[in-house]
Amino acid sequence: MVQILDGRSVSKKILQEVKDKVAKAGFPVKLATIYNEENEGSKMYVGMKIRRATFAGLISVEYKVDNSWKTDDILRLLSKLNMDSSICGILVQSPLGDGIDESKIFNAIDPLKDADGLSAFNQGLLFENAKENYIVPATPAGVISLLEAYHYQFAAKNALVVGRSVLFGRPMSVLLTNRDMTVTLAHSKTPVDQLRQFAKRADLIVVAIGKANWFQFTDLKKDVVVIDVGANKLNGHATGDVDFEKVYPHVSQISPVPGGVGPMTIATLIKHTFDLAVFQQGEQK
């Protein structure tokens, strides 16, 4: 029987754990979020994050930008937030707008306030497999937490990651490599015949290509686990990158869309913010 990897239930446990820790911490935990209020998708997603952050006991502060803002305007705002000792975590919701250099924005976030783990500093520590405290990009970290919640054994298995973005695919492949998996990183330019062969050999398949129902392969290992990171709209409905109905009968475990990786990303962001707050408290003593 196929098992659904329920990100909603796992994320609720993470949020409750954070809530309990915040209640005992004795100091406020504040998350600052920057987003473009003219982007409806960003408004909706930020609203979800703020509701869950509030549940977990965090203080949320919104900083709204619009299409008139330039990269330098946002950099000035970030500089103020970096210097504000009351801010524990900073989240920049992409996309910010046309012409905004988002790489420059992410790298301007103080690494000790980088709740999403997207700065070059934190990504560098990930690639180095550093042992000291650092923040892993939230979505890949959420995938790992989801798999761990279902007691997935990583070592000595084959993984296929489809999607090579700096925000997800590349850090995901490194996280799996650091857990002793043999990882193939494929992308939109990988020939379909090659991709089919990679999928056939994989024990774990993680798909983040940004196209609704794109992954439709069915010639898979009988015990394969499929993680769908897609967040698309199709006919008004949230749809993943994996054709769920087609692939479902051919796997042992699969994450749904919605209700899989999305809630895990949000819970991870909130956990990161608390972890950063604890670290900052130690630095101030």
From Swiss-Prot:
GO biological process, one term: methionine biosynthetic process
Keyword RNA-binding: no
Reactions performed catalytically: (6R)-5,10-methylene-5,6,7,8-tetrahydrofolate + NADP(+) = (6R)-5,10-methenyltetrahydrofolate + NADPH; (6R)-5,10-methenyltetrahydrofolate + H2O = (6R)-10-formyltetrahydrofolate + H(+)
MF terms in GO: methenyltetrahydrofolate cyclohydrolase activity; methylenetetrahydrofolate dehydrogenase (NADP+) activity
CDD domains: NAD_bind_m-THF_DH_Cyclohyd (cd01080)
Assembly and oligomerization: Homodimer.
Protein function: Catalyzes the oxidation of 5,10-methylenetetrahydrofolate to 5,10-methenyltetrahydrofolate and then the hydrolysis of 5,10-methenyltetrahydrofolate to 10-formyltetrahydrofolate.
Protein name: Bifunctional protein FolD
Gene name linked to the record: folD
